[in-house]
Curated annotation (Swiss-Prot):
This is Probable Fe(2+)-trafficking protein. The lineage of its organism: Bacteria, Pseudomonadati, Pseudomonadota, Gammaproteobacteria, Alteromonadales. It comes from the Bacteria. Coiled coil: none annotated. GO terms for biological process: cellular response to oxidative stress. Pfam families: Iron_traffic (PF04362).
Amino acid sequence: MARTVFCQKLQKEAEGLGFQLYPGEIGEKIFNNISKEAWAQWQHKQTMLINEKHLNMMDPEHRSFLEQQMVGFLFENKEVEIEGYKPPEK
């Protein structure tokens, strides 16, 4: 049976992550409080940020920036600002 968590991002009970995907205390907080669905949303935003801002994951400053964006998106209900991106019209 799948593990469930109360997802802080989505504010509902949902399927939790299968294992801790991020190291340290932040990773533990993500594992215990973020659903697979919310993590997938973050991965999409993360990819866009890396591409649009030309982030280098070998650069500690870029990793720190991305971590701040991740915490804001997952736990502080902040939207990720991606310059020049316009969502498709429905």
